[in-house]
């Protein structure tokens, strides 16, 4: 992953993601991650998912060097808080692994055991996201980059928009 900074654009908060420095193995470099993030998010959107808003742009640094970046709009700016599935999974007493454990059976058990969101809807979303990630070649979906949005004031919970798609399309 490259560097990230926060900016305000047209009155909204965005996280700018910069490409990482190229690795020694240029063929397996993540320098296209910004393009992948943008394109994959738009494909997820075309598939019917709620997804983070993304923009492609150029960032000119203090030395005048231009870099391709992706801007990801903050979907928590309305006071909602992101609860990563890893945190939700940690609240499940019977979970055999920590929140980041990747065993499918443990993930499905946590989906069934959690009480914040209807389990059948969360399970359906998980499988839909799983299939879309597979179609897009996302090798980096884990329990820390999907989850729920919690609005404590309104006492409501919803599935967070799909985000962190920079490892797709490789």
Predicted stretch roles:
Residues 71-130:
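ATP-dependent phospho-/nucleotidyl transfer catalytic cores
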Residues 1-95:
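Conserved ATP-binding subdomain of kinase catalytic cores across diverse folds
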Residues 105-169:
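Conserved kinase catalytic-core segment
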């Amino acid at each position: 992953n490259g560097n990230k900074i926060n900016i305000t654009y047209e009155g909204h908060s965005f996280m700018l993601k910069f490409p990482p420095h190229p690795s020694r193995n240029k063929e397996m470099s993540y320098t296209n991650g910004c393009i992948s993030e943008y394109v994959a998010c738009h494909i997820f959107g075309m598939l019917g998912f709620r997804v983070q808003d993304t923009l492609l742009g150029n960032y000119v640094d203090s030395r005048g060097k231009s870099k391709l970046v992706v801007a990801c709009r903050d979907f928590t700016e309305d006071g909602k808080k992101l609860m990563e599935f890893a945190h939700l999974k940690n609240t499940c007493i019977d979970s055999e692994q920590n929140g980041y454990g990747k065993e499918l059976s443990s993930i499905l058990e946590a989906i069934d055991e959690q009480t914040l969101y209807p389990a059948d809807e969360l399970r359906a979303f998980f499988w839909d996201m799983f299939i879309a990630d597979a179609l897009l070649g996302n090798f980096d979906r884990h329990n820390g980059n999907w989850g729920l949005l919690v609005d404590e004031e309104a006492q409501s919970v919803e599935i967070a928009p799909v985000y962190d798609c920079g490892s797709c399309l490789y």
